[in-house]
Amino acid sequence: MLDEGYESRIIDGKVLAKKIEDEVRSGVEALVSGRGITPGLATVLVGDDPASKMYVRLKHRACERVGIQAEDHFLPAETSQEELISLINTLNKDQNVHGILLQLPLPKHLFPQEAMEAIAPEKDADGFHPYNMGKLMIGDEGLVPCTPHGVIRALEEYNVPVKGKNVVIVGHSNVVGKPLAAMFLNRNATVSVCHVFTDDLKKYTLDADILVVATGVKHLIKADMVKEGAVIFDVGITKEKDGVYGDVDFENVIKKAALITPVPGGVGPLTVAMLMKHVLGCAETNY
């Protein structure tokens, strides 16, 4: 249980996600009435990984809420690379599909990077295509990865200044750490990127005005590793029999943080909401 008074420090991802979805719904309605275009998202799932199935369901439910037409493509686990690429090429040519999402991870015999590169950059709703990543690196933020986009949107929504601030990102994946570092640099923050192998991680995290943690290591960040008044985004998630945990020791760290995202209910809903925003943007821009 949280001590009384700490609730105001929580960045409620569900509330902000609803606001974003309301914006998307209005945009979809305007696109349908003004140009006769209904935004469409195609999801591609290979195999029967339970977590991946759940994530796809969440995205389809979000599509229903905002008026995006969603279609699902479930492929058996033994699908070949050629068959996967063939489906992606078909979706690239489908004018009713404005965004394509390849749900990861893929079965081990497949090559995810090659598959993602097969997606037309203008339909890359997840923002993972090298073309879109390259644009991000030179400051052209069109389609960017959804989780980093959600973090930036939350900072804007809570009026957290970024320019000149010390930002520390723990985790250097292509999905979160690297693109988010570029987005912070584009906003003139001073950025340090660390990971679980960084020597003396605490030395870096203690200096963070804004701390983003995305490692998947349960409670990696303790209260003595953050400074008073830091803004903290917990992107990691660890599922155990007794519950779901983030990378941050939430109950203790919140006592020092100015703002912090919970797990669950923090960054996750924002990621899905930003995906909806991206699909709308794809439809508005390319058709």
UniProtKB/Swiss-Prot annotation:
Gene Ontology CC: one annotated term: cytosol
Record-linked InterPro entries: Aminoacid_DH-like_N_sf, NAD(P)-bd_dom_sf, THF_DH/CycHdrlase, THF_DH/CycHdrlase_cat_dom, THF_DH/CycHdrlase_CS, THF_DH/CycHdrlase_NAD-bd_dom
EC number: 1.5.1.5, 3.5.4.9
UniProt keywords, alphabetically: Amino-acid biosynthesis, Histidine biosynthesis, Hydrolase, Methionine biosynthesis, Multifunctional enzyme, NADP, One-carbon metabolism, Oxidoreductase, Purine biosynthesis
PROSITE patterns noted in UniProt: THF_DHG_CYH_1 (PS00766)
Pathway where this protein functions: One-carbon metabolism; tetrahydrofolate interconversion
Cystines in this chain: none
GO terms classed as biological process: L-histidine biosynthetic process; methionine biosynthetic process; purine nucleotide biosynthetic process; tetrahydrofolate interconversion
Binding site for NADP(+): 171-173, 237
Gene Ontology molecular function, alphabetical: methenyltetrahydrofolate cyclohydrolase activity; methylenetetrahydrofolate dehydrogenase (NADP+) activity
Pfam families noted in UniProt: THF_DHG_CYH, THF_DHG_CYH_C
UniProt-listed Gene3D superfamilies: Leucine Dehydrogenase, chain A, domain 1, NAD(P)-binding Rossmann-like Domain
Catalytic activity reported: (6R)-5,10-methylene-5,6,7,8-tetrahydrofolate + NADP(+) = (6R)-5,10-methenyltetrahydrofolate + NADPH; (6R)-5,10-methenyltetrahydrofolate + H2O = (6R)-10-formyltetrahydrofolate + H(+)
CDD domains attached to this UniProt entry: NAD_bind_m-THF_DH_Cyclohyd
Subunit and interaction comment: Homodimer.
Task of the protein: Catalyzes the oxidation of 5,10-methylenetetrahydrofolate to 5,10-methenyltetrahydrofolate and then the hydrolysis of 5,10-methenyltetrahydrofolate to 10-formyltetrahydrofolate.
Protein family: Belongs to the tetrahydrofolate dehydrogenase/cyclohydrolase family.
The protein's name: Bifunctional protein FolD
UniProt source species: Methanosarcina barkeri (strain Fusaro / DSM 804)
Phylogenetic lineage: Archaea, Methanobacteriati, Methanobacteriota, Stenosarchaea group, Methanomicrobia
Gene: folD
